[in-house]
Amino acid sequence: MRAEQDRAFQEAADRDRVRMNETRERERQERQAREAQEKAKRDKEEAIEKRKAWRRYARKHLLPKSEGPIRVALRVPASSERNIRNFTAGPSTLPLFVYAETLLIPTSDTPDSDPDQPPIGFTPPYDFRIVTNYPRKEIELKEQGGEEVWATIKQAGGALFAEKKEDGTWGEAENGDSDDEEGDDY
């Protein structure tokens, strides 16, 4: 009978030990998941701040003067305004995409307070597309060979729309939405 009690006691102790180990492991996994979630949130906030700083830097240093024969009226999801600017056709369509990024700068951020250096280690994702109104054609971001794209813009009368890509974050901080609940696409 004593041996049976010892065996039952040992089995209960083993079950308790297994249960405690499982509880510890579950708590460790929950803690790691919570820490990973907090880190992802911090990283996202940091990326948003860097993007805002880059936009202001781009407005001051990368955006060409509004001159040239191609008049563009660009609408962005953040507002329904037609933002008009003139461009010179060239091999790159990058100025158009930089312009679209700078349209999301809040009016409270004046140009004289724009930074002289871009955020360290930040490369803009350009997670939006620019399309012509009619016929609907996507304007490609090209570093070279963009002359055809500028011709397409000119044929469309310069009426363009910018819209967020499927998994993009473009404009989220400005609109205050971190989910894609309201479809921002036009």
What are these language model-derived features?
Residues 1-186:
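Ubiquitin-system adaptor modules
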